[in-house]
Design a protein with these regions (language model features):
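A short beta-strand-loop structural module common to alpha/beta enzyme folds
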Residues: 29-45, 150
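Helix-loop-strand module that forms the ligand-binding subsite of alpha/beta enzymes
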Residues: 49-133
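Charged, often glycine-rich, active-site loop that binds/positions anionic groups
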Residues: 47-53, 159-163
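Hydrophobic/aromatic beta-strand patches that form the interior of the parallel beta-sheet core
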Residues: 5-7, 33-35, 62, 103-105, ...
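N-terminal beta1-alpha1 ligand-phosphate binding loop
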Residues: 1-35, 167-168
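A short helix->loop->beta-strand "cap" motif at the edges of active sites that frequently abuts
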Residues: 2, 97-101, 141
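Glycine-rich phosphate/pyrophosphate-binding loop and the adjoining helix
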Residues: 23-27, 129-173
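Generic recognition of short, well-ordered alpha-helical segments
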Residues: 17-21, 46, 74-78, 158
């Protein structure tokens, strides 16, 4: 199995059973390294050099977060701003994201139909996280899948386990 770094950002994890289920899965498996940004950087002072060095040690990445006010959590946005280095775009500089698989897992309390052109918010999740998608594309990462868990706060334990199993099967493809 590929050595996987999970970059996880949820400012209110204690209120998210869906995210906790996946976090517990990552912690129990040796091929996954979980980095909870809100746990690691409660003061929002990111050690960018250390993070860049860490990225080089992994074969693939999972970026997991909830939609908060129609975007990524602020600490994740800051992490990307601080860690992603424009020098990686130069030919003679190692780009730790180039060619690496990236899986994005997004949870939201909203209904799927609300996140559509004709829905309540008139924007899709892909549009709301487009900054992340563009950043990963510029740095030549391979976005393998974007998993969206709608109404995550209303899922039963059984539905959460089914969502987790579905995501695990995507990782194993």
């Amino acid at each position: 199995m590929k050595k996987t770094l999970v970059v996880f950002a949820h400012p209110y994890l204690e209120h998210s059973h869906s995210n906790v289920e996946l976090v517990n899965f990552y912690v129990r498996h040796q091929h996954f390294t979980l980095r909870d940004l809100y746990e690691e950087y409660p003061d929002f002072h990111i050690a960018a050099f250390r993070e860049r060095k860490r990225l080089k040690n992994y074969d693939r990445f999972i970026i997991q977060f909830p939609i908060i006010w129609f975007g990524m959590p602020p600490l994740l946005r800051l992490w990307i701003d601080e860690v992603f280095d424009r020098s990686w775009l130069k030919d003679d500089v190692e780009n730790p994201l180039e060619g690496k698989e990236v899986y994005i897992v997004v949870t939201t309390g909203g209904k799927e139909r609300s996140f559509s052109k004709t829905g309540t918010y008139q924007y899709t999740i892909d549009e709301l996280i487009s900054g992340l998608i563009v950043s990963l594309n510029i740095f030549k990462a391979k976005i393998m899948d974007i998993t969206i868990v709608y109404e995550a706060n209303k899922l039963s334990k059984k539905e959460i386990i089914l969502q987790k199993q579905k995501f695990i099967s995507i990782l194993n493809q």
